[in-house]
Amino acid sequence: DRLLDEPSNLHLAISPHAQAGQPLWVAACDKAWLKAAIAPLEAAGRPVSRIVPEFTPSEGVDPVMPTLHALGDSTQAWLVRSNTQGVLALPLQAAAVQALANDASWQQASFFAEPAAVASAEAIVGRQPQVQQATQRWVQSSQTAWDFAQFDLANSGRQRSAKKLGDAWRKLVHAPQWRPAR
């Protein structure tokens, strides 16, 4: 609805399943930060063809049922909640989490935590999370259709074609029928 920064300072990306006339998600992040993260890869001759967000709004049919992720460690941990209504990151502290805990879906939500955040997450949230390494979460993120490489970060036509082939290959390789071969 409103941007908290100047549009020229932000990189914007549209959700992958956007349809004309329908509500859609627009992701926003600091353009300078994103370009600085990409620059070393491109300087090393590794052009970036896809930029995947770590967390996205859920695409499930239940708009209320969230997924919770505890990140970080016991000294600096975060709780990330995602559902079809968006993504929210809060410090993993009792006061910050209290408003979410009153939600009826809280106890039924899928709950994951990085190994270093398990103890503090369990103590504050009041239930045991499933342990999930950050790398596991990143692999799951890479399997979504989201891509921030849009607009001024989109590559040439040849690179876009290669990207489409790569996307098709990734879908094929991650298809359930190929699981025994992996």
Residue spans of the language-model regions?
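Hydrophobic/aromatic-enriched cytosolic interaction surfaces used to assemble or bind macromolecules
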Residues: D1-R182
